[in-house]
Amino acid sequence: ELARLFAEEYHRTPIRGYGTMAHTYLHAIGQGTPWQQATREVFDGKGSFGNGAAMRVGPVGAYFAGDLKKVTDEAIQSAVVTHAHPEGQAGAVAVALAAAWASENPKGEGKAMLEFVLMNTPVGETRDNLERALDLSLESRPQEAAALLGSGQRIISQDTVPFALWCAARHLGSLSEALWATVAGE
């Protein structure tokens, strides 16, 4: 159902800035190709590990906060319709976990959030970079963090999610400061 809704919205507004591969699979889904097939066919049959699933999953984590299994399962389900590659799904899981943790721990510490996310994110490159984020001092400059973790310029989970979560951990109490740190890391 979610894939169908994405495809319908795409056909209503195809020039909204979708990524190249999103054009490919959303068009295919709209033409009747099953989403499971369409999303796996991109990138030489490996599926996307872009950061789109991670960008939209925050509310899933907040909604299911308190139920770790549900947060993880629902994050994967929301990701798989557009991101068949395990790294794209891992990024969504990590962001959902961070949102769940933050909604349960409004006065929590950034390092504790990163530890929680790291412990529960699937094994892979996204998780490896989250481990680097945890090891990096929250007092480091955003430019240093971006040099180590990536800054999202590659538009993939592996280099977007760890940096974004490091910025969030660094400024848990201030959305504005977290966003400025993210921009400073370019």
Regions found by a protein language model. Give the residues of each.
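Structured, active/binding-site neighborhoods that engage oxygen-rich ligands
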Residues: 1-186
